[in-house]
Amino acid sequence: MIGSLTARIFAIFWLTLALVLMLVLMLPKLDSRQMTELLDSEQRQGLMIEQHVEAELANDPPNDLMWWRRLFRAIDKWAPPGQRLLLVTTEGRVIGAERSEMQIIRNFIGQADNADHPQKKKYGRVELVGPFSVRDGEDNYQLYLIRPASSSQSDFINLLFDRPLLLLIVTMLVSTPLLLWLAWSLAKPARKLKNAADEVAQGNLRQHPELEAGPQEFLAAGASFNQMVTALERMMTSQQRLLSDISHELRTPLTRLQLGTALLRRRSGESKELERIETEAQRLDSMINDLLVMSRNQQKNALVSETIKANQLWSEVLDNAAFEAEQMGKSLTVNFPPGPWPLYGNPNALESALENIVRNALRYSHTKIEVGFAVDKDGITITVDDDGPGVSPEDREQIFRPFYRTDEARDRESGGTGLGLAIVETAIQQHRGWVKAEDSPLGGLRLVIWLPLYKRS
């Protein structure tokens, strides 16, 4: 097996070219209608018939008035069973031929006229053999044998040889499966590499040993790809560990700050400055909690999955959100509630994902929020619409990044930490789903979540 892709393509090209040239050179010779040499047995049979006909003519005195009759008698007597003999005079007259055969006989006589080198050729269901030289006194005749063809060539084969374009088309059709297989085998490593790259793009950092096989070029690319995946996985693990460690380390001074604030309130009473310190401490505490949640969600091994039904998973989240909306003077409508659709995943992560986008809508809406659920044979689609200020098209892809903030009024004063939607995207992608932002028919932002249904294998 050739290891280099370049050498393999080069070899396939020249092999294909050689096969085409071989076909071009050899196919005409495979046409059974071509002039071919006689076998030794056929040569001996022809010479023996030639001698018998000459002897018969020598024993039959010539008759100037009925000269052709003695020729008929001679060829009829010595014609082999199932075959016929023809005699051609020096003037070109054919003795013993039928009218329907004259065209092919004339064609053969025009190609085979050397008695020292007799040949044979097939014409459909008959075959002509000759010529052999017959002497009759001062006259010379050419003797031909007409017999049934041993294996007549089919009309379709004849059509192929007579029409080169049709032969080319048939050759292309016959060679197409082989060429498709060759193309598939050459492209197979590229498809594997592409699929592995797609998995990495979706956040699935795992090595693919099968990439380190095949042609040398793809083998080297596969090895480099696996090294890259290992480096990315190591970097992501280090980043998540660092994020988790920082969050835990921030807990201690934050706890001390909250304790000091409580002691200061007890001694000095309430004040605007103290209230501001408490507010910022609470926000910092929320941010640390969100960082820890996101760090845990990014580590797939930390997610304990189970089978759960959608209505059991999200009913409480929707009830609580409806109550909060009522307290805020807003309306939350569930157009189509979730049904008993099976999902497989971590209940806490999935519950938190919907809760985050619903709270996001509550936070930024003016008066109205709508939640809808739809299901098909593949998965569940959840839409959350609000009538708030919305998000510009250029910011929609960015709002799922940690700490990303738009230029509008969606800032920290609204109560957010900038991590909610990042947590949502991480959780949904962990469950092989996706989340995206669109314009809402209510005038604000629409967030769409899709999750695959659980199908028992």
UniProtKB/Swiss-Prot annotation:
Describe the outcome of a gene knockout.
Loss of the Cpx envelope stress response. Decreased resistance to the antibiotic amnikacin. Single cpxA and double cpxR-cpxA mutant decrease transcription of degP. Decreased transcription of cpxP. Hypersensitive to alkaline pH (greater than pH 8.8). Decreased numbers of stationary phase cells bind to hydrophobic surfaces. Greatly increased resistance to hydroxyurea, probably due to decreased recognition of mis-folded proteins which eventually leads to decreased OH radical formation.
InterPro entries found in the cross-reference section: Bact_Sensor_His_Kinase (IPR050398), CpxA_peri (IPR032404), CpxA_peri_sf (IPR038515), HAMP_dom (IPR003660), HATPase_C_sf (IPR036890), His_kinase_dom (IPR005467), HisK_dim/P_dom (IPR003661), HisK_dim/P_sf (IPR036097)
Intervals, Periplasmic compartment: 30-163
Catalyses:
ATP + protein L-histidine = ADP + protein N-phospho-L-histidine
User: What controls its activity?
Assistant: The two-component system is activated by envelope stress such as overexpression of some (misfolded) periplasmic proteins. Activated by spheroplasting (which removes the periplasm) in an autoregulatory cpxA-cpxR-dependent fashion. Cpx two-component system is induced at pH 8.0; in a degP deletion mutant induction is halved. The kinase activity is inhibited by periplasmic accessory protein CpxP; proteolysis of CpxP relieves inhibition.
Give one Pfam hit by family name.
CpxA_peri
Q: Which Gene3D superfamilies match?
A: 1.10.287.130, Histidine kinase-like ATPase, C-terminal domain, Two-component sensor protein CpxA, periplasmic domain
- Residues bearing the modification Phosphohistidine: H248
Keywords attached to this Swiss-Prot or TrEMBL record, sorted alphabetically, are: ATP-binding, Cell adhesion, Cell inner membrane, Cell membrane, Kinase, Membrane, Nucleotide-binding, Phosphoprotein, Transferase, Transmembrane, Transmembrane helix, Two-component regulatory system
Comment block on domains: The periplasmic segment (residues 30-163) defines the sensory domain. Conformational changes in the cytoplasmic HAMP domain modulate the mobility of the central alpha-helices (which bend at Ser-238 and Pro-253) that allows formation of 1 kinase-active state.
Q: What does this protein do?
A: Histidine kinase member of the two-component regulatory system CpxA/CpxR which responds to envelope stress response by activating expression of downstream genes including cpxP, degP, dsbA and ppiA. Activates CpxR by phosphorylation; has autokinase, phosphotransferase and (in the presence of Mg(2+) and/or ATP or ADP) phosphatase activity. The kinase activity is inhibited by periplasmic accessory protein CpxP; proteolysis of CpxP relieves inhibition.
The name this protein carries in UniProt is: Sensor histidine kinase CpxA
